[in-house]
């Protein structure tokens, strides 16, 4: 029989802990346990065990867990379709909230503001993600676009992919954002070359590249602040 969380000391149970101390006091695995709700009798895993396995499978990256499909989630023994559907629903709701949050921001005024917006989303990712913020003539947010996923190079991050949506949305400027899975935001020579290439392409198209911000683990690097752009 699956060892139930109900049998645990009350101060260790996720639900009781949240009610007493607030949701922020829970670990990622404990929060997932509340979404998963029950353990699995066949495997003897508790809901927290399943939550921990999910986090481990995706390298502690909530972004990559959130983008996983049902087949990837149910690959874990004990994670049936109902549990996987609950996890997908929670991440989809969080993604929609994140989008609303972006819409509610009047404008980006500093590199720090960009970092504050993106670092929780990107800091634990095992892969590099390259995103573009589209801005109007008053630096107000139009939307965000993901350009690539995986190792950055000039063949993947092509001006065509970066500026295609900018042209469609009549954007006046863009801010480039990507993460370094190592946690060190120091730009590589490839990063610098890509940025210069995109800036030159933007100048030809009349779309300004305002900054390129690299997200690290608790820190960031702004090409403008560093004097690279």
Swiss-Prot record:
Q: Which family does it belong to?
A: Belongs to the UPF0758 family.
Q: Which domain of life is it from?
A: Bacteria
Alphabetical list of Gene3D superfamilies matching this protein: Cytidine Deaminase, domain 2
Indicate what this protein is called per its UniProt record. UPF0758 protein Ppro_3582
> According to the UniProt record, which cysteines are disulfide-bonded?
none
Q: Where does Zn(2+) bind?
A: 178, 180, 191
Ranges of biased composition (kind: Basic and acidic residues): 7-19
* Region span, Disordered: 1-20
User: Which keywords does the record carry?
Assistant: Hydrolase, Metal-binding, Metalloprotease, Protease, Zinc
Matches recorded under NCBIfam families? PRK00024.1, radc
Q: Name one GO biological process term.
A: proteolysis
Question: Residue ranges of the MPN domain?
Answer: 107-229
Residue ranges annotated as motif JAMM motif: 178-191
